[in-house]
């Protein structure tokens, strides 16, 4: 077999044949060897930078800091910047896709797409690039912050930041802001940090007593009671909550106490602290999940001091829409001021808008508050205000009208039950409208007795009375009417005695039905649906026409003729007798401003007490709506 010679060996063989002198041979071999080496060195192509780029990007994805450090010229800067961005973005994952390489012998550029997985299913995607250089046959990543994001400079990182949405206000039906976004402050004790809680309880009690002397709205706390609660607590214990104004008085007195802190909390702050505090508290509880709006977010370029320099992505927040309640600021103030004129009594007033069922006002004196939400839930004999329903039943079931002649003797014996008018007054035989206006008990006892069992109860439900309502934010009871299987039950029910029971809320709803033509669905918070046990029915026109005429006559020439408020007012008075005395009632509506009302003074005697309160109420409504202070709420109180 012929010998095989490589490129260098061929040159060498040729030289051996031609060289005759050994010195020349040695020199020639050296020359040929050098030439051979030069040829081999120029032959291979440059090695690709792509594997190094891919390894670096994989290290970024997996946060392999050791691997990254070995591939870049600034390992400490690279790893710290990447860690800062991971942390700043609260990143849940990172995906990087190499999209292309540009390369020559010693310089390469890698182009890639970066996608960050962020909390709450959010992502951030963008394109960027890195530069690699080759030295001594090795490719190295030249570190720049732009490897992470093209907008990053030295000592900068990316950061995910929440953009808080404007929180919702609570607005009255007449457009006044009742509650606005603000802050409350919770006094918290960390019991785990205290060996003995008793000294702390004593200090807190003393601090609050001192603050109470500055602001009477700050409640005192008994040191012994607090110590017992702290001893039973496990970890943090919430002592009480303060408004922003109250916290100003409390903070200097509790600062520095071991284990004690004031925590700031977002809250709906009442602008007028004296306005229906119980009602405002109920509204606040009902809408607390609706006030925050939709938080936005941004990705910012942030320096080492935490200052945001620019945004690389931004999603604006969506402010929560205002929450509207049926409460009317002017009507509520007027109602509260009116009942407070009888502060010595359990006086209360409920106002409803007949056209849509908005609960405009619920007002009670402090004495009434002692028994709870009696304006909405209290059950009292309604007395003669109930004659609205008896009259409606007589018109619909017995064919009566305002001109029908009915008996109104001073007393009437009905199946052994002697019914008596107030002071036994007697009118003789008179039109139904006059008997209604003068409130003849005997007339309506007679009408009711002649009804069939259940007819009066059914009529009540047509006016919302006896219907069960589930009103978000409120608990209410309208009232009850007996079935009337026994004649005596029907007799007493006809003029609001016996087993008839009513709340001011229930009677306000009856008057609202007369005004509207069918029972409006009562509601407190717009968008919070009220559920009712019975579907409202439209009252026949002839029934409404007769009722309206009779209720108007009560005010113009009947038992409510002392009404001094302006406007076209319809009503019915009532004095409900009980063993201890009698309750004073008045219910009705004013045509011009779409207000139905019911007023009750427990043990108030004659109905004049409630007529006077209602008259003052309507006059105050007019004053508020026409005066310079119209709809003016004070600044938000902390």
Features from the language model and the residues they span:
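N-terminal export and membrane-targeting signals
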Residues: 15-32, 45-46
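C-terminal motif of bacterial Sec signal peptides marking the signal peptidase cleavage site
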Residues: 39-41
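Conserved SxxK-family serine transpeptidase/carboxypeptidase catalytic domain
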Residues: 43, 92, 97-99, 105-106, ...
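Short solvent-exposed beta->alpha transition segments
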Residues: 45-51, 65-111
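Exposed beta-sheet edge and beta->alpha loop/turn motif
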Residues: 103-162, 550-553
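Small/polar-residue-rich segments within soluble enzyme cores
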Residues: 113, 140-144, 148-150, 158-170, ...
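Short pre-catalytic segments that frame enzyme active sites
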Residues: 147-164, 179-189, 194, 198, ...
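Beta-lactam-recognizing serine transpeptidase/beta-lactamase-like catalytic domain environment
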Residues: 347-378, 393, 397-603
């Amino acid at each position: 077999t012929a010998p095989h010679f490589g490129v260098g060996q061929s040159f060498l063989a040729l030289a051996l044949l031609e060289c005759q002198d050994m010195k020349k041979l040695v020199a020639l071999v050296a020359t040929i060897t050098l030439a051979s080496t030069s040829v081999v060195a120029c032959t291979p192509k440059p090695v690709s930078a792509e594997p190094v780029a891919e390894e670096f990007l994989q290290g970024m994805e997996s946060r392999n800091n050791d691997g990254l450090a070995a591939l870049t010229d600034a390992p400490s800067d690279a790893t710290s910047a990447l860690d800062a961005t991971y942390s700043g973005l609260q990143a849940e994952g990172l995906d990087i896709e190499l999209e292309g390489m540009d390369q020559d012998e010693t310089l390469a550029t890698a182009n890639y797409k970066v996608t960050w997985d962020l909390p709450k299913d959010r992502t951030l995607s963008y394109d960027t690039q890195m530069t690699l250089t080759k030295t001594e046959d090795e490719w190295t990543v030249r570190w720049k912050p732009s490897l992470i994001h093209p907008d990053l400079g030295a000592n900068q990182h990316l950061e995910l930041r929440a953009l808080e949405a404007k929180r919702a206000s609570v607005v009255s039906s007449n457009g006044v802001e009742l509650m606005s976004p603000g802050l409350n402050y919770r006094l918290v004790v960390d019991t785990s940090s205290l060996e003995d809680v008793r000294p702390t309880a004593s200090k807190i009690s003393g601090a609050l007593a001192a603050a109470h002397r500055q602001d009477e709205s700050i409640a005192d706390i008994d040191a012994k009671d607090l110590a017992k609660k702290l001893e039973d607590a496990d970890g943090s214990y919430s002592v009480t909550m303060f408004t922003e104004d109250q916290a100003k008085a409390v903070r200097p007195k509790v600062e520095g106490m071991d284990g004690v802190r004031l925590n700031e909390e977002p809250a709906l702050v009442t602008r007028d602290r004296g306005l229906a505090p119980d009602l405002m508290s109920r509204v606040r509880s009902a809408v607390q999940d609706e006030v925050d709006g939709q938080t936005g977010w941004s990705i910012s370029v942030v320096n080492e001091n935490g200052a945001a320099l620019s945004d690389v992505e931004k999603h604006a927040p969506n402010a929560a829409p205002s929450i509207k309640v049926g409460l009317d600021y002017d009507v509520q103030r007027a109602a509260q001021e009116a009942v407070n004129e009888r502060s010595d009594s359990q006086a209360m007033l409920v106002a409803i808008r007949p056209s849509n069922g908005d609960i405009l006002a619920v007002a009670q004196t402090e004495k009434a508050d002692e028994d709870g939400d009696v304006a909405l839930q209290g059950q009292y004999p309604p007395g003669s205000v109930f004659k609205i329903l008896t009259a409606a039943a007589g018109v619909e079931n017995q064919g009566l009208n305002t001109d029908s002649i009915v008996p109104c003797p001073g007393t009437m014996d009905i199946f052994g039950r002697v019914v008596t008018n107030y002071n036994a007054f007697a009118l003789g035989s008179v039109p139904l409208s006059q008997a209604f206006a003068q409130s003849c008990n005997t007339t309506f006892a007679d009408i009711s007795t002649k009804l069939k069992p259940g007819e009066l109860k059914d009529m009540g439900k047509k006016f919302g009375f006896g219907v069960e309502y589930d009103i978000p934010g409120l608990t209410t009871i309208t009232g009850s009417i007996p079935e009337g299987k026994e004649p005596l039950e029907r007799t007493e029910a006809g003029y609001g005695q016996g087993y008839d029971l009513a709340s001011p809320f229930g009677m306000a709803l009856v008057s609202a039905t007369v005004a509207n033509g069918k029972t409006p669905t009562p509601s407190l918070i717009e968008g919070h649906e009220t559920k009712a046990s019975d579907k409202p029915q439209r009252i026949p026109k002839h029934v409404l026409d007769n009722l309206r005429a009779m209720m108007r006559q009560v005010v113009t020439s009947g038992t409510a003729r002392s009404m001094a408020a302006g406007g076209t007012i319809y009503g019915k008075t009532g004095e409900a007798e009980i063993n201890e005395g009698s309750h004073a009632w008045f219910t009705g509506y004013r045509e011009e401003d779409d207000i139905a009302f019911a007023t009750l003074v427990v043990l108030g005697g004659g109905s004049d007490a409630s007529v006077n309160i209602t008259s003052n109420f309507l006059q105050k409504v007019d004053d508020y709506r026409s005066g310079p202070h119209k709809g003016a709420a004070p600044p938000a109180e902390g």
